[in-house]
Amino acid sequence: RQQYHKKQSWRAAAPTPERQKEVNWRLDQAISPGLVGEIGIHQIDLVNWFFMLRPTAVTGFGSLRQWRDGRTVPDNVVAIFEYPGGLFLTYEATLGSSFDGELNLFFGSDCAVMLRDRRAWMFQEIDAPQLGWEINAIKEQFYKSTGIVLAAGYSKAMPNQTAKPAEVPQDPKSPLQYALEAFVINSYNHQAAIRDFTSAYDPSDTNALKQYLDEIAKMRVPAPGWAEGYEATVAALKANQAVAGNQRITIEPAVFELG
């Protein structure tokens, strides 16, 4: 389950009606991908990566409840994605309330994992098998549930203590820094692999080179590429189409392919 709750109009001020129309293109349903396309695309990409699957269908609903100012894009949307194997993603977004902000929740039979504000917690079921490391992990209370902080190096740093949010260090690196680092590392390793291959084997053997690079690709630093971006875009646009028509849309596998 994913959500984006933020009370804001999405409308920008402009000196003339013409300029207002230009800067507020996101409010025009004819050209805007809507909340699910503008905001939800990043969260949908996360689920596609987590499941390692593409959605097969999406059902959408939308309405204008808060900002009835002439816009045609809904300010409240819900989209339910269907994935192979009976998996579902429920995505909701609103511009009418900021309560509970933005989060990503993955529900499993042994635990649930919540991601928000670049932090993560695991909520174990009572009958879940013990993993061992979580016994000494930092824990935080969420209403009636206890969340085990998921952070590298924090399973033994403060044994059996409950940390306050302010006491848990935030990651100093931005998402952009991680993305650029991954790009540089992967690009260098790819180029080095080609040099190694051409120095040891016949460079005209493209099939062997492809197999070699496919093996090297398995060791890449996690980073999204054009294919992941394209797939997330397709899913988000299909969801916006479903929201606009309050309908269920089947997503054919062919739409995720290029060429």
Regions found by a protein language model. Name each.
Residues 1-71, 101-105, 246-248:
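Predominantly a Rossmann-like dinucleotide-binding segment in NAD(P)-dependent oxidoreductases
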Residues 53-61, 88-92, 113-116, 193-196, ...:
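Acidic/polar loop patches that form or flank catalytic/metal-binding clefts of enzymes
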Residues 30-37, 63-68, 92-94, 163-174, ...:
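Active-site rim elements
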Residues 34-37, 41-48, 74, 174-181, ...:
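A structural signal for well-ordered alpha-helical segments within the folded catalytic domains
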Residues 69, 82-179:
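NAD(P)-dinucleotide binding in Rossmann-like oxidoreductases
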Residues 182-259:
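C-terminal helix-rich "cap/oligomerization" subdomain common to oxidoreductases
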Residues 11-20, 130-168, 192-219:
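Charged, glycine/proline-rich intrinsically disordered loops and linkers
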